[in-house]
């Protein structure tokens, strides 16, 4: 494990640059600053249905202070963002590893040496930023949301990444980005770690990389058509190309959204050679595979919307000898896939998945802030020993956000999921969240 000094260095550099300019130029730095205090109460319960195992149960309260500065005046503006967060355990789910227990801690809090969840933990993310014209560079803590890398926020505290990113919007309708990620702070940790993938992220031969390079472009060809290309490279593990198309078609009655995605992934560095794979630079994958990254994934999703209703149907196909490669340290991930379920991801070697969903926004009948969503995944042909495996998952969620009055800023969410299959755990899961956000200035 590594303690991240990158964010602290970025903060000192940005703050030093800001203080070095005249006080008049610092006016916008302060005037355009914003700060928000957020609270998040989170409960999760997981029940394994096909094994004699204790249920996993945890409950906690988190506090977030999100400060975003403006930029100093002048051709080149400097700024500083700070995201401080702290989590307190309300119920840790007992003690892991104890015999004859009915419940055990999950993955919300780091574990003490005695198997109990820590009483509390936290971290501070700091990001220095620089702006020139319509181009912005950021150094320090990042929360990426790109096809090749998405941060995960599925527990009490979010996953953080640490590195550098530059984004340019100099050309109308075209957004360009590029950067490098060196470490991540997992959602149940206060420390930073190197990067890895499924198959190499645990055990005595676990291997990690501190070099994830990315670049991408989003082009708004028309007001209804978005074209995307992204590239990601986790050194010594994989190279990945992504092509995407999103089109909104306004029909005489309702609208139809088309979402097409294609990923091509290949081996890189030590994963390319047998000697490197012998060191542990391997990917999970099909039965009998060498551990070399070899994956193609394409999907199509169509969503018809009308008067608050949204009906979706999609299909995803995975081919190649390896599972879909992505940064994965084993404590939670979010993927830019139409099969990014609450529990499973449906991205194993050979897997074919049908997706069907229904969502309703109650604003259509005069209840703004209330939304529901039901989605079902069915995957088969998973390449496994002996025979092809299959799995399915059902997700349901309901969200409500208070729109006005003294409770404005309060939100509630219930997420329910069930997954079954012949290649893993049969699991039922419930998550409850109560959130509150208060702008300070």
Question: Which role does the model predict for each range below?
Answer:
Residues 41-43, 137-151, 176-178, 215, ...:
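Transmembrane beta-strand segments that form the barrel wall of outer-membrane beta-barrel proteins
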Residues 151-158, 184-187, 207-209, 231-242, ...:
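Solvent-exposed loop/turn segments connecting transmembrane beta-strands
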Residues 308-387, 393-396:
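C-terminal structural cap/anchor segments
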Residues 35, 75-77, 134-138, 173-177, ...:
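Repeated loop/turn-to-beta-strand initiation elements of outer-membrane beta-barrel proteins
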Residues 16-144, 363, 388-393, 397-403, ...:
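Beta-barrel outer-membrane channel/assembly domains of diderm bacteria
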Residues 37, 63-69, 126-130, 164-168, ...:
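Residues on the lipid-exposed face of transmembrane beta-strands in outer-membrane beta-barrel proteins
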């Amino acid at each position: 494990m590594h303690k991240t000094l990158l964010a602290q260095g970025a903060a000192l550099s940005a703050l030093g640059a800001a203080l070095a300019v005249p006080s008049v130029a610092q006016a916008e730095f302060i005037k355009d600053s914003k700060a928000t205090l957020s609270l998040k109460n989170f409960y999760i319960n997981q029940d394994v249905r096909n094994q004699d195992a204790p249920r996993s149960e945890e409950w906690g309260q988190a506090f977030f202070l999100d400060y975003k500065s403006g930029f100093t005046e002048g051709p080149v503006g400097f700024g500083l963002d700070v995201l401080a967060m702290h989590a307190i355990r309300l119920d840790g789910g007992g003690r892991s590893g104890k015999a004859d227990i009915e419940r055990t801690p999950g993955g919300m809090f780091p574990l003490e040496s005695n198997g109990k969840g820590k009483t509390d933990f936290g971290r501070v993310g700091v990001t220095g930023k620089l702006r020139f014209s319509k181009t912005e560079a950021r150094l320090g803590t990042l929360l990426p949301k790109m096809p090749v890398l998405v941060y995960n926020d599925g527990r009490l505290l979010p996953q953080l990444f640490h590195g550098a990113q530059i984004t340019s919007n100099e050309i109308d309708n075209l957004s360009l980005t590029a950067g490098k990620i060196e470490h991540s702070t997992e959602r149940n940790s206060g420390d930073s770690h190197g990067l890895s993938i499924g198959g190499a992220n645990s055990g005595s031969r676990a291997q990690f990389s501190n070099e994830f390079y990315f670049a991408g472009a989003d082009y708004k060809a028309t007001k209804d058509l978005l074209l995307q290309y992204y590239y990601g490279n986790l050194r010594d593990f994989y190279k990945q190309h992504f092509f995407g198309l999103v089109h909104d078609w306004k029909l005489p009655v309702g609208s139809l959204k088309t979402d097409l995605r294609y990923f091509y992934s290949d081996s890189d560095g030590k994963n390319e050679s047998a000697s490197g794979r012998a060191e542990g630079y391997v990917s999970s994958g099909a039965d009998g595979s060498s551990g070399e990254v070899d994956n193609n994934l394409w999907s199509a999703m169509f969503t018809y919307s009308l008067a608050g209703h949204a009906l979706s149907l999609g299909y995803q196909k995975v081919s190649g000898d390896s599972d879909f490669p992505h940064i994965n340290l084993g404590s939670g991930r979010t993927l830019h896939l139409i099969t990014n379920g609450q529990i499973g991801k449906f991205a194993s070697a050979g897997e074919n998945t049908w997706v069907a969903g229904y969502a309703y926004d109650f604003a259509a009948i005069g209840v703004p802030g209330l939304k529901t969503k039901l989605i079902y995944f069915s995957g088969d042909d998973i390449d496994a020993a002996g025979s092809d495996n299959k799995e399915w998952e059902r997700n349901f969620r309901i969200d409500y956000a208070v729109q006005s009055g003294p409770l404005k800023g309060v939100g509630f969410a219930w997420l329910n999921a069930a997954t079954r299959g012949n290649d893993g755990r049969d699991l039922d899961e419930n998550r409850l969240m109560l959130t509150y956000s208060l702008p300070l200035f």
